[in-house]
C-alpha cells in the first residue's frame, strides 16, 4: 500500500506541470528557512523580541507567580499564554538561537496544518495545488518575521486554523442530533478557539462569530448548550487572571490601556485602513476573477459599490475628516507606506484600496449573509479597536478566512484554472515580500530614517 502511494507520488512529479509546481513549493520553503539563517527582518519588528518576549519567557521560567503578578511591568499588552507555552513546553527556551529556530520550525508546521485543513475542505483539489496555495503564508513578511525571531503571533494562527477545522466539522452536522463524535468536535473547537484567543486577543471575534452562526442557522440546542459549558470551562484561566489583576489586562502597570490603546472611539478612524487591508489581500483574487470573466460582468459586480465608497472617502478627505491618514509614522500598512513614497502625506492610493476592500465585502455579504457576515462583521468591529492598526494584525488572517471560512464563488473561480491562479497568487505575494525586504533592509533600515524621510521629528 505504501509502495503504491510512493510510486503514484513520483509519477505525479514526472509530469511537467506537477514538477514545476513542486519546484515552486520547494523554492518557497527554501526561501523561508533561508530567511531565518540570513536573519531576515522584513517588517522591522523582529528585534523587539530581545526587549519584550525573551525577558518574559525567562522570567516565567524562574518564577511563574511573580511574572503573572507583575506582567504589565514588562510592557506587553497581551495575555501571557504564548509566553507560558514557550517557557514550559518549548524545550529550546534556554537558548535564544535554538528557541528562534524552534519557532521557525513550528511556523513551518503551521503551513502543513493549513494545507491539511484546506485539503479537508477542498477534497477535489490535488494535494500539490493545495500545498502551493498554503505555501503563500510562508511568503508573508509579518508571518516570516514572527517565525524567524521567535515572536508570539504564529501560535495564534495555529490554534485559529485548528479551530476552523473543527468548526467546519460542526457546520456539516449542525442540524443533526448530537452524537459522541459531534460533541468532541464542539469541545475541541471551543478549546482551540479559546487558545487562539489567549494567544491573540483580537481572535475573540471567533467565538462571537461561532454563536452568531449557530443562531442564524438554527443549530440544535444541544450544540449551543455544549458550547456554552465548554467555553465557560476554558474561560477559567482568564477569570483567574481577572482575579489577580483586577481586570482582563494588568491595568495597575498599564492604567491607560482601555482609554488610549483599546477603545471603541478608534472604530471610525481605523475603518478605511482595515478596508485597505481587505483590498490588498483580495487584489490577486480579483485579478484572477478578472481573467476568468468577461470584462462587462466583472465591472458590473464591483463598479457601483467601488464608486460609492470612493466618493464617500473623497468627500470625507475634502472636508479634512481623513487628514490624519497623512500623518502616520507607524502602522497603517504597506499601501499607506507606498503612498507616502509616491507623495508624502498623501493617502489617495489607500482610499482606492479601501474602496476595493469595501466592494469585495459587499459582494461577500450578498453571496451568503448567514455565513460570511457572521464572520466578517465581528472582524470589522474588533480589529478597529486599537489606537494604531498594524497590518500584522490581519496577516495571514484574511487569507485564512477566505479559504477556510467564506462561502463565495471566488473560490470556484480560483480553482477553475488553478495553475494560472496559483501563478498570480504566488507572484503577487513574492513581490510583496521582496518589496518588504528592500524597504526594511535597504531603503529604511531604521525607524529614524523613515521619520527623516517623512520630515517628522
Regions found by a protein language model. Give the residues of each.
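Transmembrane signal-anchor helices characteristic of membrane glycosylation enzymes that use polyprenol
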Residues: 17-50, 234-245, 308-320, 380-383, ...
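Membrane-proximal lumenal/periplasmic loop motifs of glycosylation machinery
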Residues: 38-48, 62-87, 96-107
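Short acidic/glycine- and proline-prone juxtamembrane loop motifs at membrane-interface regions
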Residues: 145-155, 390-391
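Membrane-lumen/periplasm interface segments of specific transmembrane helices
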Residues: 197, 203, 208-213, 219-334, ...
Amino acid at each position: 500500500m505504501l509502495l503504491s502511494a510512493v510510486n503514484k507520488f513520483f509519477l505525479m512529479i514526472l509530469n511537467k506541470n506537477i514538477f514545476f509546481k513542486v519546484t515552486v513549493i520547494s523554492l518557497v520553503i527554501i526561501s523561508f528557512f533561508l530567511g531565518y539563517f540570513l536573519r531576515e527582518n522584513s517588517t522591522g519588528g523582529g528585534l523587539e523580541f530581545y526587549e519584550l518576549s525573551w525577558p518574559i519567557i525567562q522570567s516565567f521560567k524562574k518564577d511563574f507567580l511573580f511574572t503573572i503578578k507583575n506582567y504589565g511591568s514588562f510592557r506587553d499588552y497581551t495575555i501571557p499564554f504564548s509566553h507560558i507555552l514557550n517557557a514550559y513546553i518549548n524545550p529550546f527556551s534556554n537558548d535564544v538561537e535554538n528557541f528562534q529556530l524552534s519557532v521557525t520550525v513550528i511556523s513551518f508546521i503551521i503551513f502543513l496544518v493549513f494545507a491539511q485543513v484546506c485539503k479537508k475542505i477542498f477534497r477535489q483539489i490535488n494535494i500539490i495545488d493545495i500545498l502551493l496555495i498554503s505555501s503563500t503564508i510562508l511568503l508573508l513578511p509579518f508571518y516570516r518575521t514572527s517565525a524567524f525571531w521567535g515572536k508570539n503571533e504564529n501560535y495564534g494562527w495555529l490554534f485559529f486554523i485548528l479551530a476552523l477545522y473543527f468548526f467546519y466539522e460542526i457546520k456539516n452536522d449542525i442540524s443533526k442530533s448530537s452524537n459522541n463524535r459531534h460533541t468532541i468536535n464542539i469541545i475541541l473547537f471551543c478549546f482551540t478557539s479559546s487558545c487562539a484567543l489567549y494567544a491573540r486577543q483580537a481572535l475573540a471575534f471567533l467565538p462571537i462569530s461561532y454563536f452568531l452562526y449557530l443562531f442564524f442557522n438554527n443549530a440544535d440546542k444541544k450544540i449551543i448548550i455544549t458550547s456554552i459549558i465548554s467555553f465557560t470551562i476554558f474561560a477559567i484561566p482568564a477569570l483567574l487572571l481577572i482575579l489577580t489583576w483586577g481586570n482582563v489586562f494588568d491595568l495597575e502597570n498599564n492604567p491607560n490601556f482601555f482609554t488610549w490603546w483599546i477603545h471603541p472611539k478608534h472604530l471610525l478612524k481605523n475603518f478605511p485602513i482595515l478596508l485597505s487591508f481587505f483590498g490588498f489581500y483580495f487584489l490577486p483574487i480579483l485579478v484572477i476573477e478578472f481573467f476568468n470573466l468577461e470584462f462587462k460582468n466583472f465591472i458590473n459586480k464591483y463598479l457601483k459599490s467601488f464608486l460609492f465608497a470612493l466618493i464617500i472617502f473623497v468627500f470625507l478627505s475634502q472636508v479634512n475628516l481623513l487628514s490624519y491618514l497623512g500623518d502616520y509614522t507607524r502602522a497603517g500598512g504597506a499601501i499607506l507606506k507606498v503612498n507616502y513614497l509616491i507623495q508624502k502625506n498623501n493617502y489617495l492610493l489607500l482610499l482606492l484600496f479601501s474602496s476595493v476592500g469595501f466592494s469585495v465585502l459587499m459582494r461577500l455579504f450578498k453571496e451568503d449573509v448567514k455565513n460570511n457576515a457572521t464572520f466578517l462583521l465581528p472582524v470589522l468591529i474588533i480589529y478597529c479597536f486599537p489606537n494604531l492598526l498594524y497590518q500584522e494584525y490581519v496577516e495571514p488572517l484574511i487569507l485564512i478566512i477566505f479559504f477556510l471560512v467564506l462561502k463565495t464563488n471566488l473560490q470556484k473561480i480560483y480553482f477553475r484554472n488553478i495553475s494560472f491562479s496559483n501563478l498570480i497568487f504566488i507572484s503577487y505575494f513574492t513581490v510583496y515580500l521582496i518589496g518588504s525586504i528592500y524597504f526594511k533592509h535597504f531603503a529604511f533600515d531604521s525607524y529614524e530614517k523613515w521619520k527623516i524621510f517623512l520630515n517628522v521629528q
